[in-house]
């Protein structure tokens, strides 16, 4: 199995180094790591370049904004037969890739997501994150599986479902897993030790949690595809301009 890791970034200078450093410590080294810069205005690219001699690293720039565009751009240049899409604020433990490879081979999973633990001093944030992981694992056994933050797919599955939908404003990750399920691929939630930063919760406080709940409710009451801005999100997709997104709150 040749594993390509794709990391979409927009202004992630404060966290991307931690992820790349963690990837240098993997017992099973990634075959390829692609950082996709999505119009950053900080030093994300420069900080990523510091790892060019430590990792099989490639840095590219997405031609359009949005997380879906960035992930698809990374997949377009990736050479692996297994693609892993990681948010920049994740910190996997040293056995992350080794555990992933074993579980995928054992269960013949073709697409899905990973369990995560929220790194936070606040118990309410940790409990909220645990709830979301539990919800994801529950939904994996329904016709409507979901995934977020860290996802994977075989190259064949990715190409069959046409990757991530750039027309979606949010929850393109949910849609990605759902499309794979509907295409007949076996979905699996990989149990790993991977920490996720609580920075969005620290920056937005309870608003971040409310946004997640609102997005989920909106998704089920207005259809599973959210194509218009329902709140401000810098990595959102869809047909609106970045100015329109920034003015949405």
State where each predicted segment sits.
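Short, well-formed alpha-helical segments that are part of the catalytic scaffolds
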Residues: 11-25
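Short beta-strand/loop segment that forms part of the nucleotide-sugar
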Residues: 30-39, 60-63
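A conserved acidic beta->alpha catalytic loop
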Residues: 37-46, 90
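Glycine-rich, basic loop-to-helix element that forms the pyrophosphate-binding segment
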Residues: 62-78
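Short aromatic/hydrophobic "clamp" motif used to bind/position activated sugar donors
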Residues: 83
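Conserved donor NDP-sugar-binding/catalytic core segment of glycosyltransferases
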Residues: 95-124
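Short, flexible, basic/aromatic active-site loop/helix in glycosyltransferases
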Residues: 113-149
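Acidic donor-binding loop at a coil-to-helix junction in glycosyltransferase catalytic cores
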Residues: 170-176
